[in-house]
């Protein structure tokens, strides 16, 4: 009896241990697993989904904005590279012209047509802030436009406008007999502004493209002055000697001789 009783008691204890959790689960509130709980979870999932959608939208917009910035920077880099290439090419042209003058090379006697074409791609331009300042509008008449540019030279407050006017003149009237003078004045105006490389470019252009112009001797002398200003005594002497030999008796040759005597 005692053995059977123990077995029955053990069996009853096991049944109670197993049944208790199920009873507790059965007594749990229906709301925790009912329709309200599902709706809450659905609502929460919808909120999460909406938040994810908003985040994705923001990320896409940010990527789009970043791409626009990258494209803009790429454009600026390309523009800066182009401008740098132009500056380098212009410096090469200036050095070639000065070297040919100081060495008395045959390049100074070459046809102006080929040189004008080469110079056109590297011609120095006016500052962006003054390019559209107040230069006269093209009249269609070379004499009128040249005289208008000269009038600007005489007005000390409009030197930048004068530079633009002469640049436009060279562009608009490529066959004008005033081209040597226009280039000479551009050289002088740039020199007055301290732009000696640009000044040397224009003075050298007069000598190379228009060696028989009355302005050629003075223009070559000015190239020598610029070389002397820059501390290149050897080139300055060579240019002065070229002025004396190529244009004897001219005012430019006389000035060159004075410079040589003082060096």
From Swiss-Prot:
Keyword tags: Cell cycle, Cell division, Coiled coil, Periplasm, Repeat, Signal, TPR repeat
InterPro entries recorded: CpoB, CpoB_C, TPR-like_helical_dom_sf, TPR_rpt, YbgF_tri
TPR repeat ranges per the UniProt record: 143-176, 180-213, 217-250
Broad class of where this protein is predominantly found: periplasm
Coiled-coil residue spans: 44-88
Chain residue ranges for the region called Disordered: 106-139
Domain of life: Bacteria
Compartments where located: Periplasm
Record keyword Hydrolase present: no
Gene3D superfamilies per the UniProt record, alphabetical: 1.20.5.110, Tetratricopeptide repeat domain
Biased composition (Low complexity): 106-123
Similarity comment text for this entry: Belongs to the CpoB family.
Subunit annotation: Homotrimer. Interacts directly with the central domain of TolA and with PBP1B. Binding to TolA disrupts the homotrimer to form a YbgF/TolA heterodimer with weak affinity. Forms a quaternary complex with PBP1B-LpoB and TolA.
Comment field on protein domains: Contains an N-terminal coiled-coil domain and a C-terminal TPR domain, separated by a flexible linker. The N-terminal domain forms a stable trimer and controls the oligomeric status. The C-terminal domain, which can also trimerize, is involved in interaction with TolA.
Function: Mediates coordination of peptidoglycan synthesis and outer membrane constriction during cell division. Promotes physical and functional coordination of the PBP1B-LpoB and Tol machines, and regulates PBP1B activity in response to Tol energy state.
Record protein name field: Cell division coordinator CpoB
Species of the source: Escherichia coli (strain K12)
Encoding gene per record: cpoB
């Amino acid at each position: 009896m005692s053995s059977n009783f123990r077995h029955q008691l053990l069996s009853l204890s096991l049944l109670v241990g197993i049944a208790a959790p199920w009873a507790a689960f059965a007594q749990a509130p229906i709301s925790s697993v009912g329709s309200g709980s599902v709706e809450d979870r659905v609502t929460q999932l919808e909120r999460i989904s909406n938040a994810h959608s908003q985040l994705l939208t923001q990320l896409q917009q940010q990527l789009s904005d970043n791409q626009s910035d990258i494209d803009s920077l790429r454009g600026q880099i390309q523009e800066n590279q182009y401008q740098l290439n132009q500056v380098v090419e212009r410096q090469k042209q200036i050095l070639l012209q000065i070297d040919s003058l100081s060495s008395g090379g045959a390049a100074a006697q070459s046809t102006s047509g080929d040189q004008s074409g080469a110079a056109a791609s590297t011609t120095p331009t006016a500052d962006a802030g003054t390019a559209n300042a107040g230069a006269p509008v093209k009249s269609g008449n070379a004499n009128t436009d040249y005289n208008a540019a000269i009038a600007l030279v005489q007005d000390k407050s409009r030197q930048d406008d004068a530079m633009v006017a002469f640049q436009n003149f060279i562009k608009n009237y490529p066959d004008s007999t005033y081209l040597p003078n226009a280039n000479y004045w551009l050289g002088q105006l740039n020199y007055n502004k301290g732009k000696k490389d640009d000044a040397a470019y224009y003075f050298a252009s007069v000598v190379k493209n228009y060696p028989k112009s009355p302005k050629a001797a003075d223009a070559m002398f000015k190239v020598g002055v610029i070389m002397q200003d820059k501390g290149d005594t050897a080139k300055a002497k060579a240019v002065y000697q070229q002025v004396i030999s190529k244009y004897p008796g001219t005012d430019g040759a006389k000035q060159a001789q004075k410079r040589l005597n003082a060096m």
